[in-house]
Structure formats: structure tokens, C-alpha cells
């Protein structure tokens, strides 16, 4: 009897213990699920940040190029007074979908309001507690070229590149936010509206809030609601993350890890996104073995080039593929081509290593008929390669000398500088997206390319970009045309082992010259592109190819006639570099005919 009584007394205790264990097990399962499905930010999305010498979080010098800090302070004081004296506030009505996007949970809903000081937010209180996000606005004296200078000392020979400060809110003082609402400046259609620093600042404030203080769903996405006539910057807020659009309201659900990666990089091209050389000097390359050892391949990636309208770059594309394979890359090589490339040459391109994909050309509606750049917008087809998460585009007049796989760790748009705040589109890191392709195509009749080609156009679409070292896409030119510049660059072209990652051949291409010397020397207007050292480097790659591929680099009779005519003119005008005196031994000087 005593034993039965004890068992009966213990039964409720065991039942309670079992219930407690089940609850604990369920909680542990939920926690494990959340961790398991959290996208890894250590390899694909954020590994690029480990190379940054001065990131968005750290670049805070006291002087903006040519602008005294005192002037900025005074200007910002004026901005504050303007805000305080704003008498007529705009009554801001919420979008119709406001209720459905707010997830009600424990505690009061918190809504962060950015750049809303001049708005009447009375009606918003029914949705939750509105929190004004305070930050100091950039001065009107702060110009785009301060963030995107034409030149920086990449090798740090005389100075260490730094970026001017863009003020941000005090994030540590803020609580978690259920929603970030942003009033985005839009000065369209004023000239230069895309490169307004305040526009960039507000986009960055929104991105930082979403990444650092935004509550996330099970997909680790936060919510950002923009109010603007202009679309938020697609360089920061991808159009793929646009969930709803209603009048001037834009609802985004960005992936937090993607935002974190972008925010880890310098705020402009004022510093390198990828410093390849150690502080000891340009000859000491960073040891990347640890990064490469830790790197997995969670995404599909490829190198891509494009051929269209003629076969004049077939030889260049063959040589490019061979140079990439010599770097031991394991990424796919994709070649986009139109119907202008013959079957014979397509077979040669495939034999060189390219996987072929046919495209339909895209015409620039503002180009003159039959002009050289009439179909240069065909390059936009790159964004339709959506079976790849990331691609690196490389022009067919480039050879690669060192492995470039590291660039896959960097976001769109990463490239090398060209002129002023413009990047060079010869090598670009791209994230394919049908949505982005549609955005690019939709503005063809509106955007006027400064150079009539894809480079000028893309620089108006992606104005916020990340500077890669010029040695990643080393241009074969000598703009100052000084002996010092020529000596430095020619030494880099000839260095063994290679000190540049890729050489971009401007002017007459190597396969359109005799192999004996760079034929740019024969034309006065082309002298800025002339380099025998770079010429020899290209032919070294060519000579390593199979004979069956080399024959596609033969000269046409027409081109041979042009070369001989230019040599004759150089002799008649007494060109003092005397390249016209060089005895031509190139066997292609006789066997000059078209293949296929």
C-alpha cells in the first residue's frame, strides 16, 4: 500500500518532467533550424571585406579633398537651421499594404523614420512607435569626385588613400526596428542627379539600419520602405528584392548578409576594395593561400566574354580563353556570340575552352547606323546569365596573367578606374539578374553614353562602384607619354613572374600587327598605346597555343596591306622611334587570308 501511494504521488511529477523535456526539445529544434538556414556570410558574401584596408566603417579622415572640415561643419549648421524653420510639414499617408507587412509580435512595433523631419507622421502612430533616426546630413560642398577621385595612390608610394566621412546615425543607441521607412531624395531630371552625395548617404543610412537594426524573417531578410519618385540605388538595394510598388512607395526585403558585404567595402573609389599589395611595397603580394583554402564554391560562377557583329576579335577571344586556363581556374568559360561568327570559328572558340551561347544583338537606339558602337549594348546580355550567381566579364582584347578567381568574392559593380569617376568596363564583377537586365534595357532611349558605348551607359546605371587595383585590368596606354611612365609600365608588362593580373590592349590589337613589333608605333595618333614589351607578352601566350588555334590569328590580305601602308607613311615622315626600319620576319606577312 505504501509503495502504491508513492507511485501515485510520483506520477504527476514524471508527467511534468516529460512535458518540460518536450518543450526544451522543441525550442532546441527551432534554434537549430534558424542557425542551419542562416546563409553563410563568412565565405561568399563577406570574404572580400577581409582584404579592405579602410572600410566604410573606418574611413573617417578629418579633411575632404580640397574642402576644410570647418566649412562642412558650418554648412551642416545651416542645414539644421533650415530643418528647424520648416513650417509647413507634408502629411505622409502610408501605403495601402502597410498593415500586411507589419508582423505583430511581443512588444510594441517600432518603425524607424529616416529623413522624415519635414513630414507629419501623425497617422503612422496607429501602426506602432515611430522612431526618428537622426544623422548629420552631408554638406553641399561635398561632391561626388571627393568619393570617386580620378586617381589614388594605390601603391601608397607618397600617401595612404583615405575616404572622406559620410556621417551615420549612432546605431548602438538604437533598438531593433520592425520596419525602416525612408524619404529618399530625388532631383530627377536635373543633370547629375544620380551622383548626388545626399542621395547616396540616405541609401547608405537605410542599408546600415536594415543590416544592423532591422528585425529579420526566417530568410534573414529585413524590411525597408522607401518613399520617392526615384528608384533606390540598385547598387545597394537590388531590384530582385523589390516586393511591392505603390505610387511613390517601394517596399524592399533585402538579404542582410548581402547588405553587410556591400557596407564592409570602402564608401567610394577613394580607396581600394581589394588591396593586393602589402605595405612593404608593390613587389610583395598578399598571401592568399589561407583565403583560398577556406573558400568553398557555394555558388555557380563563370568568366564571360562577348563577340558580336564581326569576327575581328575571334583571335583575341581564343587567346583570352587560353590565358585563363593557364591560371588554373576551375570556373566555367562562357562566350556569348551572335550569328556573325562562322561555324568554323565557333568550333575553334569551343576548342580553345569556351562554352558557346548564342545571343541576339542589342542596338543602341541613339547610335548612328553602321557605326562601330551600334550594337555595343549587346554586352547587356551578361545579366541574363541567371544560371550563374556571379560572373566576371572580360573583354576579348585582354589576356590574363594571374589567377583572378579572388574577384568572385566582390559584389557588383567592382571594376578598375578609367577617367574622373568612371570605371572601365573591360573587366567587371556582375551579378546576373533578369530584373536588372530589364532595368538596364528600359533606359536606353533616355541615357546618353558619354562614349557612345556600353561603358558610358553602364556608368550611368551603376554610379556607386568598388575600385579594384589597376593591375587587375592594366590598360596598355601612356597618357602622359613621359620616359618615366613608359619605363615603369614596360617593366610591369615584361616582369617575370607577372606583376599585373591582366593586360588590356588598347589601340591596334597585337594580332592585327606583325609579331616583330607593336604597329601602334607607325601611327602618330596611336603612339600612346604603343609598347613592344606588352606586344611580346601577348605573343608569348599566343605561341603557347596549339597550332590549330594559332591559325585563327592570321592576317587578312586587307590588314596586311594596311600595316605596310602605315609603315611606309612612318618612314616618309621620318618617325624617330625607327620601328619602320625593323626587318619583318613574321611568317603571316605572306600567308594572309581569311579562315572559314
Swiss-Prot record:
Mn(2+) binds at residues 395, 397, 504. This is UDP-glucuronate:xylan alpha-glucuronosyltransferase 2. It comes from Arabidopsis thaliana (Mouse-ear cress). Its cofactor is Mn(2+). Pfam families: Glyco_transf_8 (PF01501). Its EC number is 2.4.1.-. Substrate binds at residues 395-397, 424-426, 451-455, 504-509. InterPro entries: Glyco_trans_8, GNT1/Glycosyltrans_8, Nucleotide-diphossugar_trans. SUPFAM superfamilies: Nucleotide-diphospho-sugar transferases. It is found in: Golgi apparatus membrane. It is a single-pass type II membrane protein. Keywords: Cell wall biogenesis/degradation, Glycosyltransferase, Golgi apparatus, Manganese, Membrane, Metal-binding, Signal-anchor, Transferase, Transmembrane, Transmembrane helix. The lineage of its organism: Eukaryota, Viridiplantae, Streptophyta, Embryophyta, Tracheophyta.
